UniProtKB/Swiss-Prot annotation:
An MF annotation (GO) of this entry: 3-methyl-2-oxobutanoate hydroxymethyltransferase activity
Gene behind the chain: panB
A Pfam family assignment: Pantoate_transf
Domain of life: Bacteria
Quaternary structure annotation from Swiss-Prot or TrEMBL: Homodecamer; pentamer of dimers.
Enzymatic reactions: 3-methyl-2-oxobutanoate + (6R)-5,10-methylene-5,6,7,8-tetrahydrofolate + H2O = 2-dehydropantoate + (6S)-5,6,7,8-tetrahydrofolate
Protein name: 3-methyl-2-oxobutanoate hydroxymethyltransferase
Cofactor note: Binds 1 Mg(2+) ion per subunit.
Cofactor(s) listed in the protein's UniProt record: Mg(2+)
Amino acid sequence: MTTLSTLNKFKKDGTKFTCLTCYDAMFARMMEKAQIDTILIGDSLGMVVQGHDSTLPVTVDDMAYHTANIARSNKQALILADLPFMSYVTLPEAVVNSRKLMQAGAHVIKIEGGCELCELITTLAQAGTPTCVHLGLTPQSVNVFGGYKVQGRGNEAGQKLLDDAKAVVDAGAALLVLECVPAELAKAVTEAVAVPVIGIGAGADTDGQVLVMHDMLGMVHGRAPRFIHDFLTDERNTEHSIEGAFALYQQSVKEGSFPTEQHQFS
């Protein structure tokens, strides 16, 4: 079974690892067969499962339901679960909501933000709840950003993101996710912190990669993000199957053939 210790060893050894979003039992079992290292029950389910335009309507109960689906069905992957929008504004509600997701079967709680999360991160760590901090393009802040845009460009913005990464790790964060940031910045963050860093649209130098499952299967509504690749129709997927797509993703990340320069930002 993959644990945080496994991911830390991967980072130390320079071994890349995989993460995919997942929301139901059948796909969770397929990912177990493909040996996907980590699974994220993302609040992205609001868009790809529930049909919303953003992640904002997702509730803690939604997240707990889908987390339990995965925990019952995949016994090998490390399971990360998102705390959804406005569910961790105050420390007491954050603790209560984190407990709900951990009791549903999550191993790590994912939250979005920077140094303002440090007190929460430390509190959860002391209570035995590991956190993964999502930096860069944080979808719960889409209205603040004015849309889905690359973050961390320019010296000032890049330094702020690097400082936030160091601060949350110092506070006790066990993992980081970097989304849609320049590849050079992602590399700098990965080298600067001791914990594993997972990238999405952040270049090839992060310790691991994550994609939304629907995206990597070519199930995209509207314009496809630059950082995705359709592993279902890839000619290397000789089975032309979903299981084959998961296995090809695992292989491609491990061997370093995904992502490439075409999937990253400068």
